């Protein structure tokens, strides 16, 4: 596609928040034969257990959300700065089974991003600020869009330090 269409206009990711989406939790409870009124009161271990127990429900619910996202993107021709000319996406599954999507989008009538017109498109489409007047949105952004270090991050950081030390040793004694 890149050979035919050129570089994509946008790279998007869409992650499944299977432990917190209320409709997802209700679908999981239905699959488990339980009352959906319990959805908001499930503990973290209970949510995790449901997610691990019903991967097909997770995949189907995620597909419904992806389809809704695609309908939104196609109907709202200016939400990405111009009409979608083409797209490609791939769904992958994280270690615990949660799906996420990586998407390339080609939009038509988008100026080069290095031009003043292109910068205006970026400023209109991309946001990295919090609206202080919308506490619900602020909480969502803080919970879902801000990176928090995990054990995996620390493990990777430790591996990087070991690699750097090894590189330094190689410079001192290349035969090691």
Annotate each PLM feature.
Residues 1-101, 105-176:
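Intrinsic low-complexity, intrinsically disordered terminal tails and linker regions enriched
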């Amino acid at each position: 596609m890149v050979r035919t269409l050129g570089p994509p206009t946008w790279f998007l990711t869409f992650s499944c928040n299977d432990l917190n989406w209320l409709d997802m939790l209700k679908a999981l409870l239905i699959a488990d034969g339980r009352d959906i009124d319990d959805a908001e009161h499930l503990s973290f271990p209970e949510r995790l257990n449901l997610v691990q127990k019903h991967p097909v429900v997770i995949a189907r619910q995620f597909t419904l959300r992806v389809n809704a996202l695609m309908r939104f993107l196609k109907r709202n021709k200016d939400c990405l700065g111009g009409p979608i000319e083409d797209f490609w996406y791939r769904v992958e599954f994280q270690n615990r089974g949660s799906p996420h999507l990586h998407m390339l989008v080609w939009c038509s009538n988008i100026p080069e991003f290095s031009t003043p017109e292109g910068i205006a498109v970026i400023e209109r489409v991309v946001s990295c600020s919090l609206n202080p007047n919308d506490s619900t949105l602020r909480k969502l952004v803080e919970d879902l869009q801000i990176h928090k270090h995990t054990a995996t991050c620390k493990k990777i950081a430790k591996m990087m330090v070991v690699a750097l030390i090894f590189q330094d040793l190689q410079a001192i004694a290349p035969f090691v």
